[in-house]
Amino acid sequence: GYSFSKNFFSDMGAYAARNGDQNYFSMILFAMSLTIVGITFISYYLLLPGLLGNNRTNYILTWVGTLFAIGGSVCMIGTGFTPSDVVFAPHVFFANNIFHCFLVTALFYTIVIFRSDVLRKRYAIGYAMFFISILTYVIILQYGPSVNSGESALIFQVLSQKIIVIVFCFSVIHQTFGFTKSGILK
């Protein structure tokens, strides 16, 4: 079965479960869910330049952030369609680059929200915290212990991934409240 502390999210999208059983249903749900989330993020970030690009500099910065968000979203979709037990290298490429791309997105949108008068500054602080969280996770990906070096290293990497995904979800919720309170979303 699936272990919260020893299985990455991607293990739900594997072709076969760790015990050798076929994992078709979970694999299909995993791919579909990441596709839906990826398409939703692409749509969301394509709208933001029109909402936050209230001057030339912000408009340019939002588009840079949006381009990286699209890249991260495409990587999210790619992660769903590359089961780790079938095509490991492409899967790792897509999975890691979700966070590399959204790191750049978070940096640019932190700057934009600080510069903009559309959202209150606390939402920029929230985005800055999101940036720091992703940066921490990217550092863990690059320099943290290898999952193959022992059980404690595996647990550390798996729980780090769980934490950043939870932070990602809360960041989206926080931004949604910001746009709702500002009257942009009704």
Question: Where would I find each of the regions flagged by the language model?
Answer:
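Cytoplasmic juxtamembrane regions at transmembrane-helix boundaries
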Residues: 40-69
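Extracytosolic (periplasmic/ER-lumenal) interhelical loops and adjacent juxtamembrane/interface segments
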Residues: 1-22
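Terminal transmembrane helical module of multi-pass membrane proteins
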Residues: 105-186
